[in-house]
């Protein structure tokens, strides 16, 4: 199993080119199933989850070509299979997004119940009940969700009992080829939903209201080819801003938009960081100052993103003062805290809240990653700890951060990937 060896403490400073957003690329890739003509996508990140999505699409009969510049050509005009198999789906919960476009275009689809990060219950119930309201017939059989429809899906008014990014995207995809109009109420508002809507509209869909809590989709009989540029990854952006903030550095994130990160930037400024923005970049300068502790409460967009909670837990671990970090989106998303405590952090978990008393210096340790965002916080902790830190189970990082060690080295980190031999693991 691969691990990272990280040496510290080092100041992390420089310029980082931000990759395309994983959380936009995945639904957009699955949405290509809807198109009867070829699609061209740019700024597609090179990630394990993207590779898994390619494998699922190819299993369905989609033709995919990718060049060295991240341009992906996709042709879904000759899909002949309608099953996303367990051996691929088990590693990635986003695989459920294959179901809606399959049943919308081909009136049938099967997806194995998905896997992914182990951070609490992420049921697919809202995906299923929404499709049923649009006329799909759903069966759960031997670990598979099977959806069929007698002809086109029907437009419907769908109220989301809980704000759900995944279910909002599923309904939006399904509704593009449904008969009549669909209205999603209490819809998620994330920037990745807006980007997916832009992509679908470029294919000929008619979607309005994306980015608000009410989205309207007027169904079309067919969708065509298009070109689309994947939006920049706001979570990668926020992660590198935190990297500078905890290490006394100065960093510029290029090719990214500040308006997708308002809550994060506000908290960084509250922590005493100087943050300046341009149309396509964000710069954070610590001025050599230790961050001040900030209280965090995760919320659906435009609130503070749950995918930045682990990084800000680390920031608060080395900040001046005491903070409260409340996680309202997912269960079990504090699994990084015991690992940070092994490195000398002082954090206690009380229900869905962590109380963190900042320390001046972290210590090196052997730690284990438990999910994507927790794992990057442990790597960054190693960058500022005094000595050598080993981070195990780094496959989580490869699911969501493109070329992470190369990018970290460019801003001053001392990090290497290695594979522990079987004999040394015994």
From Swiss-Prot:
UniProt superkingdom: Bacteria
UniProt cross-references to Pfam families, sorted A to Z: EPSP_synthase
Name of the protein this chain belongs to: UDP-N-acetylglucosamine 1-carboxyvinyltransferase
Entry annotated with the keyword DNA damage: no
Cell compartments where the protein resides: Cytoplasm
Gene name tied to this protein: murA
Catalytic reaction equation(s): phosphoenolpyruvate + UDP-N-acetyl-alpha-D-glucosamine = UDP-N-acetyl-3-O-(1-carboxyvinyl)-alpha-D-glucosamine + phosphate
Cellular component terms per the entry's GO annotation: cytoplasm
Enzyme Commission number, as recorded: 2.5.1.7
Protein's UniProt keywords contain Cell cycle: yes
Residues bound to UDP-N-acetyl-alpha-D-glucosamine: 93, 162-165, 307, 329
HAMAP family: MurA (MF_00111)
Residues bearing PTM 2-(S-cysteinyl)pyruvic acid O-phosphothioketal: 117
Class of this enzyme: transferase
MF terms in GO: UDP-N-acetylglucosamine 1-carboxyvinyltransferase activity
Family affiliation: Belongs to the EPSP synthase family. MurA subfamily.
Alphabetically ordered keywords of this record: Cell cycle, Cell division, Cell shape, Cell wall biogenesis/degradation, Cytoplasm, Peptidoglycan synthesis, Pyruvate, Transferase
UniProt binding sites for phosphoenolpyruvate: 22-23
Pathway: Cell wall biogenesis; peptidoglycan biosynthesis
Known role: Cell wall formation. Adds enolpyruvyl to UDP-N-acetylglucosamine.
InterPro entries given in the database record: Enolpyruvate_Tfrase_dom, Enolpyruvate_Tfrase_sf, MurA_subfamily, RNA3'P_cycl/enolpyr_Trfase_a/b, UDP_GlcNAc_COvinyl_MurA
GO annotation (BP), single: UDP-N-acetylgalactosamine biosynthetic process
């Amino acid at each position: 199993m691969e691990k990272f060896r990280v040496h510290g403490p080092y100041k992390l400073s420089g310029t980082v080119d931000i990759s395309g957003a994983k959380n936009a690329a995945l639904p957009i890739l699955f949405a290509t199933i809807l198109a009867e003509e070829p699609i061209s996508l740019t700024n597609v990140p090179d990630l394990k989850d993207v590779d898994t999505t390619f494998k699922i699409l190819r299993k369905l009969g989609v033709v995919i070509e990718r060049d060295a510049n991240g341009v992906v050509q996709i042709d879904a005009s000759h899909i002949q299979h309608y099953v996303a198999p367990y051996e691929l789906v088990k590693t990635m919960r986003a695989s459920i997004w294959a179901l809606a476009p399959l049943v919308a275009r081909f009136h049938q689809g099967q997806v194995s119940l998905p896997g992914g990060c182990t951070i609490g219950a992420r049921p697919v119930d809202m995906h299923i009940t929404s499709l049923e309201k649009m006329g799909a017939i759903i069966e759960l059989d031997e670990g598979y969700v099977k959806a069929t429809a007698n002809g086109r899906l029907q437009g419907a008014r769908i109220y989301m009992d809980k704000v759900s990014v995944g279910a909002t995207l599923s309904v939006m995809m399904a509704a593009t080829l449904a008969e009549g109009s669909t209205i999603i109420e209490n819809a998620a508002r994330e920037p990745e939903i807006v980007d997916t809507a832009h992509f679908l509209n470029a294919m000929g869909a008619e979607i309005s209201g994306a980015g608000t809590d009410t989205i309207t989709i007027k169904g079309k009989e067919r969708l065509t080819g298009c070109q689309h540029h994947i939006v920049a990854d706001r979570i990668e952006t926020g992660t590198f801003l935190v990297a500078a903030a905890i290490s006394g550095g100065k960093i510029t994130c290029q090719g990214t938009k500040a308006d997708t990160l308002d809550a994060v930037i506000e908290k960084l400024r509250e922590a005493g960081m100087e943050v300046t923005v341009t149309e396509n970049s964000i710069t954070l300068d610590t001025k050599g100052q230790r961050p001040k502790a900030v209280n965090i409460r995760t919320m659906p967009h435009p609130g503070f993103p749950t995918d930045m909670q682990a990084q800000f837990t680390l920031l608060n671990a080395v900040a001046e003062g005491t903070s409260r970090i409340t996680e309202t989106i997912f269960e079990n998303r504090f699994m990084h805290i015991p690992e940070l405590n092994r490195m000398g952090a002082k954090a206690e978990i009380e229900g869905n809240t962590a109380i963190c008393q900042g320390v001046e210096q972290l210590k090196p340790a052997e730690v284990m990653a438990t999910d994507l965002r927790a794992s990057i916080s442990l790597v960054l902790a190693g960058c500022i700890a005094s000595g050598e830190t080993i981070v195990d189970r780094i496959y989580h990082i490869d699911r969501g951060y493109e070329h992470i060690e190369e990018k970290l080295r460019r801003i001053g980190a001392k990090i290497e990937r290695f594979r522990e031999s079987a004999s040394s693991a015994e």
